[in-house]
Amino acid sequence: MEIIKLDHITKQYDDGFVALKDINLELESGKFYSLLGPSGSGKTTILRIIAGFTEASAGKVYFDGQDITNLDASKRHINTVFQNYALFPHLNVYENVAFALKLRQRPESEIREKVKDALHTVRLDGYANREIFELSGGQQQRVAIARAIINEPKVLLLDECLSALDKRLRKEMQFELRAIQKKLGITFIFVTHDQEEALAMSDEIFVLNDGEIKQSGSPVDIYDEPVNDFVARFIGDSNILSGRMIRDFAVEFAGKDFECADAGITPGEKVEVVLRPEDLDITTPAAGKLLVTVQSQLFLGDHFEIKAIGQDGFEWLIHSTNGVQIGQEVGIFFDPEDIHVMRLGETEEEFDARLETYEGED
């Protein structure tokens, strides 16, 4: 069931800067969504328009089928967890979580029960009397989430709320947030510039740049089938080469012809070819589809990150569990399904239509 709809939303500031350009999106109830993009892409502006903190210059915002474009933020069934958590330092954990219910003058017995339930949901049982300064960053974040969910919102907005945590704690909180969302069954909308966070937690990702949605889809679809150069580079590491479509399921790049899994592109058309570093296997020169010379190698714990130069001068990035020697000539092998062909200037709608056409012929 649709819970949030943005209909042709545009945001232009007084200085002429256009933060959002004709944004259309529909979000279903009970799912975890991520708005992913670099700084200035418009993701936080979308969040603020949904929350009611920022007015759109044009377009409509719908909540549960009702037009809330001009509805005050305090009257929306939407709560927000901010980047800095916005906890009250002079109040303890219980008082922070209970704050909204006390403002509404709810009975003390109800407040105690709801605070207890909220703290249990975020795994902070026994922390009610702790002072905020006594908590770790991850614990403070969970207090902020408990405070946000105590009003039982239908939608929870999270604005870059993992960015202040160290790497280990960020990874832990990814599991925590996903578990909390599944337990509550409400819609989470998570803003981040970190593609790993978005891939790990989301049911669906919206990739933004320059005020536009460049692609939307499941984490697997976004990663495996980027529609353009920006998405391919922003979502994970990529080798992106210039190529030419030979015919359906055949493409030329790096001076050779290869089988691929793409079709529906005009023969002879210039394209871009994406190969992910983890899809490249290092083998002997005789067994490889291409020959490369190793330039550098970094050991990153679970794999080696290898940079190598192809015979055409292209610099390849390869992820391998096996190390190699600097200066060594090796072969790289990949399957047709590892090759992703991108049409120059193709929109997401055009890509989806092309995909349906040639998949329907199978």
From Swiss-Prot:
The complex is composed of two ATP-binding proteins (PotA), two transmembrane proteins (PotB and PotC) and a solute-binding protein (PotD). Keywords: ATP-binding, Cell membrane, Membrane, Nucleotide-binding, Translocase, Transport. Pfam families: ABC_tran, TOBE_2. It is a peripheral membrane protein. GO terms for cellular component: ATP-binding cassette (ABC) transporter complex. InterPro entries: AAA+_ATPase (IPR003593), ABC_SmlMolc_Importer (IPR050093), ABC_transporter-like_ATP-bd (IPR003439), ABC_transporter-like_CS (IPR017871), Mo/tungstate-bd_C_term_dom (IPR008995), P-loop_NTPase (IPR027417), PotA-like (IPR005893), PotA_ATP-bd (IPR017879). ATP binds at residues 37-44. Part of the ABC transporter complex PotABCD involved in spermidine/putrescine import. Responsible for energy coupling to the transport system. This is Spermidine/putrescine import ATP-binding protein PotA. Residues 4-235 form the ABC transporter domain. It is an enzyme of class 7 (translocase). Belongs to the ABC transporter superfamily. Spermidine/putrescine importer (TC 3.A.1.11.1) family. Its main location: membrane. It is found in: Cell membrane. Its EC number is 7.6.2.11. PANTHER family: SPERMIDINE/PUTRESCINE IMPORT ATP-BINDING PROTEIN POTA (PTHR42781), SPERMIDINE_PUTRESCINE IMPORT ATP-BINDING PROTEIN POTA (PTHR42781:SF4). GO terms for molecular function: ABC-type putrescine transporter activity; ATP binding; ATP hydrolysis activity. It catalyses: ATP + H2O + polyamine-[polyamine-binding protein]Side 1 = ADP + phosphate + polyamineSide 2 + [polyamine-binding protein]Side 1.
